[in-house]
């Protein structure tokens, strides 16, 4: 059985609903959470997450997102990762940002090229926070080897299932599966995201990777209300 990760946008649709969603994920034994910190130019996000980011930034700021993250961390017992953009980390100062977010397992920087990971590595290692590497269907063999080398026991490799932004349809072609297998063959956990939206997609991921990440669909269901979100998580986890 693979691991399941759910992406939630910090304080969206509101702080109250965000925290209620965290409680649902805890109740249904979701393995890990990605908590997104909204950014004004979210280049990796599709229409749903882009709109959600803009709406959230009208009402909340980084201080709010960090406060929401810490409240979530008190509730959720699994691993918690922050997903954000390089400008937020740079502008805060890497050490200051890591100190402020506190006790988390790792950070995913959506627009950080693999070749620039080294710029952050020292500070992350000093604080025992994983800097999650991305791989894509276009990743070269040397990229895969670099990602494997940099991964640590509290982290994973985030394999983007398709070209483009979050959301959309899910598929894994043979070339992508081959690259996932190459990374897994070195003993590193590989989690697949982008376009994963239902139980069928999750089961497809579990056949070739160590875990699945659901983002856009989870946020869309939460927009409908906490009951719709709970039903969605119940279905995805196979809990009835």
Q: How would you label these PLM feature ranges?
A:
Residues 1-77, 147-154, 227-228, 234:
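Conserved N-terminal beta1-alpha1 strand-loop-helix module at the mouth
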Residues 2-5, 75-85, 124-136, 183-195:
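Short beta-strand/loop segments at the ligand-binding rim of alpha/beta enzyme cores
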Residues 5, 34, 108-109, 132-133, ...:
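Conserved beta-strand positions in the central sheet of alpha/beta enzyme cores
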Residues 9-11, 38-40, 83-87, 112, ...:
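Active-site beta-loop-alpha junctions enriched in small/polar residues
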Residues 15-26, 139-152, 192, 196-212:
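Catalytic cores of alpha/beta
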Residues 31, 105, 155, 210:
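Receiver (REC) domain switch/active-site residues of two-component response regulators
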Residues 39-51, 57-70, 89-94, 109-126, ...:
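Active-site-adjacent beta->alpha loops and helix N-cap segments on the catalytic face
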Residues 97, 159-211, 217:
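Active-site/ligand-binding-proximal alpha/beta "capping" segment
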């Amino acid at each position: 059985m693979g691991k399941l990760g759910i992406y939630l946008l910090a304080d969206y649709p509101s702080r109250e609903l965000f925290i209620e969603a965290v409680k649902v994920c805890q109740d249904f034994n979701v393995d890990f959470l990605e908590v997104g910190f909204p950014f004004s130019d979210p280049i990796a996000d599709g229409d749903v997450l882009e709109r959600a980011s803009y709406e959230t930034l009208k009402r909340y700021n980084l201080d709010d997102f960090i406060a929401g993250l810490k409240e979530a961390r008190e509730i959720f017992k699994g691993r918690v990762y922050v997903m954000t953009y390089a400008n937020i980390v740079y502008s805060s100062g890497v050490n200051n940002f890591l100190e402020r977010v506190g006790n988390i397992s790792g950070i995913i920087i959506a627009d950080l090229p693999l070749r620039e990971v080294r710029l952050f590595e020292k500070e992350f290692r000093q604080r025992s926070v994983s800097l999650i590497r991305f791989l894509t269907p276009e990743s070269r063999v040397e990229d895969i080897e670099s990602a494997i080398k940099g991964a640590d026991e509290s982290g994973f490799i985030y394999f983007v299932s398709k070209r483009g932004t979050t959301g959309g349809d899910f598929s894994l072609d043979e070339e992508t599966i081959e690259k996932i297998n190459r990374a897994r063959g070195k003993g590193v956990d590989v989690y697949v995201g982008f376009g994963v939206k239902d139980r069928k997609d999750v089961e497809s991921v579990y056949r070739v990777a160590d875990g699945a990440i659901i983002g856009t669909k989870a946020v869309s269901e939460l927009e409908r209300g906490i009951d719709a979100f709970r039903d969605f998580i119940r279905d995805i986890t196979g809990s009835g």
